[in-house]
Every structure is written in structure tokens, then in C-alpha cells.
Regions:
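ATP-dependent small-molecule kinase phosphotransfer cores
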Residues: 1-95
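Structural signal for conserved beta-strand scaffold positions within catalytic alpha/beta enzyme cores
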Residues: 2, 105, 162-164
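Short beta->alpha linker loops
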Residues: 4, 62, 108, 166-167
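Generic alpha-helical secondary structure signal
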Residues: 8-15, 108, 112, 145
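Conserved phosphate-donor/acceptor-positioning beta-strand/loop module used by diverse small-molecule
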Residues: 59-62, 87, 96-118
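NTP-dependent small-molecule kinase module
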Residues: 111-186
Length: 186
């Protein structure tokens, strides 16, 4: 998630991330959270069908992503907690999305994140930007707040596992080493 090619919400999410509705700070995080939640809500029947048939659903960015990215926009910790609870209630309660057995946060060195965000990237997964920049990716300080929220969620939820993707020098581990760590918790 998000599914940029999904009707209605995929288009709205793409437009938001391009900045068509304003800056990251100017669009209320609860409204943005609802866009991402509705995208998952639209995919819920397919996920539930797969699970009912005994299959496995493996997702990149789910409910905790919504919490991290939207709560990072809220300076007041009490308000951020209210937003967190609202997102949980909306996605798992009102929309009845499947609750994961396990969440994994791949905690990468912030220097690696910064260098990746500054580099020119392309590919089909970037088509939604139409040559522009993702407003969530434009601000490294925002990315640091997102990371902090992910880390906090790992402390609060025993089903949310943090995997440190850095070596003893703070550099990014090679993919094989990260995969080995993932296999240990799965």
C-alpha cells in the first residue's frame, strides 16, 4: 500500500503526495489518514478471501504506516495519541481490516534514508509523481519523526518487531543480512 492505480483513492493519494492539495503541513492528517485507510478498505475483501482460503498475506505498509506518517505531523503528543487511536479504530474497527499476526519495521540508518531521498529515483513505482517529488519524502526532519513513531510503536506492541538494518558502524547492512534477520522473526 498505497495502491496508486486503485480507482478513486489511489488517484487521490497520488495527488496528495504530489502536493496537489497543498503542503504536507497544510492538509489535515486525519483526512490524509482516511485516504490511505480507504485504499486498504477497498482491498480488504481480497485479503480476507486469501486468509479464509488458508493463504498468507504479506504487505508493504499497512495500518502502522498510516499511524507513523500522520502522527508525525502532530506536534502535541496527546493529539497524536488521539489520532493514533482513531486510525486503529477506523481501520480495524469500522473497516474490519484483517489484524496482522506480525508487523516488521525495517529500521534503516537515517543517513541511508537521507541519501536515498536525495538521489534521483525512477521506475514504475514512481509514476504517481508525474516527475515531481513526494511531499512525504521531501523533508528529512519529517522522516526522522516518522522513524521515531515507528520505534515507539515497536515498544508498545509486542507483535511489532523492529529489525535493526545497520551494522556496528551505523552503515546499512547488505540485503542478505537483513533477510536473515527477517527470517529469524518470521
Amino acid at each position: 500500500f498505497p495502491r496508486y492505480d486503485a480507482p478513486v483513492y489511489g488517484d487521490l493519494i497520488s495527488r496528495f503526495l504530489r502536493g496537489d492539495f497543498g503542503s504536507n503541513e497544510s492538509v489535515h492528517p486525519q483526512l490524509v489518514a482516511l485516504l490511505f485507510a480507504e485504499d486498504r478498505h477497498g482491498a480488504a475483501p481480497e485479503m480476507k478471501k486469501t486468509l479464509t482460503e488458508g493463504g498468507t498475506v504479506l504487505l508493504d505498509r499497512y495500518v502502522y504506516s498510516n499511524i507513523a506518517y500522520q502522527c508525525a505531523k502532530v506536534a502535541d503528543s496527546e493529539e497524536a495519541e488521539k489520532l493514533r487511536d482513531w486510525i486503529f479504530n477506523t481501520e480495524y474497527g469500522n473497516f474490519a481490516l484483517p489484524v496482522p499476526d506480525l508487523n516488521i519495521f525495517l529500521d534503516v540508518p537515517i543517513g541511508f534514508v537521507e541519501s536515498r531521498l536525495k538521489s534521483q529515483r525512477g521506475g514504475e513505482d514512481r509514476d504517481y509523481l508525474e516527475g515531481g517529488q513526494d511531499i512525504h519524502e521531501a523533508d528529512i526532519e519529517f522522516q526522522k519523526r516518522v522513524r521515531d513513531i515507528y520505534r515507539k510503536q515497536c515498544e508498545l506492541d509486542p507483535k511489532f518487531i523492529r529489525i535493526d538494518c545497520s551494522d556496528e558502524y551505523g552503515e546499512m547492512l547488505p540485503p542478505g543480512a537483513i533477510f536473515a534477520k527477517v527470517k529469524e522473526v518470521v
